[in-house]
Structures are given as structure tokens and as C-alpha cells.
Amino acid sequence: MSNIRLFFSDTLSANMIDKLDKDQSHYLSKVMRVKENEVFSLFNKEGEWEAKILGISKNIVEFKIIKQLRQKEITKELWLAFSPIKSNYQNFMLQKATELGVTKFLPIIFDRTVVRKINKDRLEKIIIEASEQSNRINVPIIEGAQDLSLIHISEPTRPY
């Protein structure tokens, strides 16, 4: 089986037939140069699945789910609150924190924060790619940028 892993946001089930979006289809067909009947992995919050390519037409890849490889992971919550920083450093921080198991990112705007706007879609894409590469099943959530005074974090109840 190949090492290609892609995030698929929709529900997956055994013997299901579906199509990848345009970007993922381009990645598989043009970048990875996969052919019909080759196998790759898809994952979402419910688990990881083995999929087989049925066909590639008009740059859209059609696949069939063969079997489930792994069940959903139960992980402890690990949040990372950070002040947005310049792009390259922020991308690196998101990648490494995702690899380490962070489950939620909280961008916080402080009085002296230089970068005031974040492109949430771009950051989500970076987080998804880091999840694909690090063999994670669950993809961390990124919240919108908030002022520190609006953040309410309650301490979890402890069993002891």
C-alpha cells in the first residue's frame, strides 16, 4: 500500500464510491501520478480508510472505499493559545504543534500584536497537511482571532 494519505471531510463507509475535490484529484493524478486500481488512504474524524482508484477523468479522481484501517482516536484536549506572528514562523509553529498533538488553536490579539488579521482558510490547510504527514486521524480546530478579554477558558473537572 502506498503512503499517500488525504483528509476527506465527508463521511466514509465501506464500499462507498465518491470523488475527490479538484485540488486532491490534481495532487493524486498530476503530482503523485497514481493510476487506476492503485490504493491510497483517506482519513476523517471517524477513522482512516483504504481506498482504491476507480478512474481518473477530467482531472477528477473517483474512488471506492475498501476497508477501514483505523478507528477514531480518543485524545485528550490540548489547546494552544498564541499571538499571531509573521507567516513563515506561524506556519512552522502550526505544523509542529499539530505533530505534537494539539487539538485546538486559539489565536489571541494582544495590545502589541503586530499581525492583526489571520487567513483562517490558509491556516486550516496548513493544519490538514500537517495532520496528513504526521499520521494523525483527528485534525485540530482553529478558532478565529479573538481579543484576550473575550477568551473564557474553564478548568476541566478533575477526577481526584
Locate each region found by the language model:
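Short, well-ordered secondary-structure micro-motifs
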Residues: 117-119, 150
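Residue-level signal for inorganic ion chemistry
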Residues: 37, 97, 127
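Single conserved hydrophobic/aromatic residue that forms the stacking wall/gate
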Residues: 151-160
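Conserved functional loop/turn residues at catalytic and ligand-binding sites
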Residues: 33, 101, 157
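N-terminal positively charged helical leader segments and presequences
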Residues: 1-71, 121
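Ordered, amphipathic secondary-structure segments that act as subunit-interaction surfaces
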Residues: 74-116
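Anionic-ligand binding region
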Residues: 126-134, 139-150
